[in-house]
Structure formats: C-alpha cells, structure tokens
Amino acid sequence: MLEINLNHYNEMLRYERDMDELRALALWITRCDPNLSIPGLAKPREYVFDLIQHYSKKFAADIKQHANISPDSIDLFHSSLFSVKLILGITAQDLEEASQQQLYRNSGFWEMRRFIGQFGDVAEAAVSAGVTHIVSAAISGCIIGEYLGLLMDEQFHQPVPVDHMVFLRSGALPIAGLLRQQFQICGDHVLIADDAVMETRTAAVMLKKLREICPDVKISIMTVDIDPETKYSEFMKQFEQVYAFDE
C-alpha cells in the first residue's frame, strides 16, 4: 500500500475512502445498543471508540513526523478493520451511507495541509489559554484534534486528553452527540476541534452535549474552515476563544 502524502491533492479521494472506513465505525456506534455484548468483545461500543481514537492518533503522529500517512500504518489499518467489520456486520452499503452523511466534501482533515505550519501557533495559544481537554467532531475533526494534542504535549509539554464525539444524524445534519460511556471532562476548559464551521449545527450539538455534562465548563473551538458570516455571528460569542487559520 502506498503512503498518503499531504502534498498531493490528487490523493484526496484515496484518503477519503480510508476515512469512510472510520465514518462507518462512527455510524455503527450510533446504531449500537450501549449494553451490547459480542463473544470475545465484552464492550464493542467502547472498543469501536478506541479504534477510532487509535488510528486517528496514529495517522496524526505519522503526519507530524513524516508529513504523510505511512504505508505500514495504512496496511495495519485495513487489516484490522477487515476483521472488525466482519465481526460487527459493517457492509459496503454502510460505508456508502456513512460517506454520504458528510456535511461537506473536500473539507475536513485533508484541508489541514494548507495550514500545517500554523498549528504550532494554535497549540501555543491553547496552552496559554489553559485548555485542559480536546473534544473532536468525528470523523473529519479526529485527526485534527489528535494532531493538536500531540503538538501541545511534545512542543509545549502540556499533555491533554483527546476524545471524539460521534453524531446521530437526520440525513447529513447532526442532531445529537455521543461520547464514550465513561467520558468525563478533564479540567475546566474544553477545546472543540472541528473540520469546518460553515454553519452552527454541529458546534451547537457539541455545545449542548458538553454543557449537559458540565454546565460551567469553558468551551473554545478550533476549525480549519469557517464561513466568514458564521465567524462573526452571535452564536460564536458563546466560545471563550475561536481559533481559525489564515490563508
């Protein structure tokens, strides 16, 4: 399997096919009974959350070190998911449905390549602002959030937990957020990592979920793409900080 190089835009479609595998896992979580038990897999829902996090972090580490997702990581990813999909009953139709549920095409993690040099500045600002927890919008925000977490840890010696929120959807629109069963907010300042804030729907769902867990927590947001009208809207004033990127 060839590497996926961030500098080659024509590799986006191949990258997106791999991300559809993770999107199908997220879709499975939304349909799963939280108490489901599978022989040999006592807590499948939590295991799938672990898989999403493991590969998001692995891909982020590859990008930080090599500016690409390595062939070994991709091979391991496909080998692991082949077995997992069989066990969970995830089909090609599920992958297609998960792909179609994206709000935005040609956005998400792939677009971070335009701003890769600015992530260090955001990490430094997040450390200075006292960010204690990152929650990513799955799936497109997962690698973005993990990448930022790595920078905060390795460059600024401020490790923070990174979690991933998946979404129940009506069509492509998120209507509710789901987190691990044992999820707890760490500290008092959460940073939402989202791929694109071209509207307020996803961010609103994430805000609601986090406020249900801890009404007084401070919440900031980082996004790769943001609609200018949304950026200066009343809605965005709910956030402590809004971290965006300059072309």
What are the residue ranges of the model-derived segments?
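PRPP-associated nucleotide enzymes
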Residues: 1-247
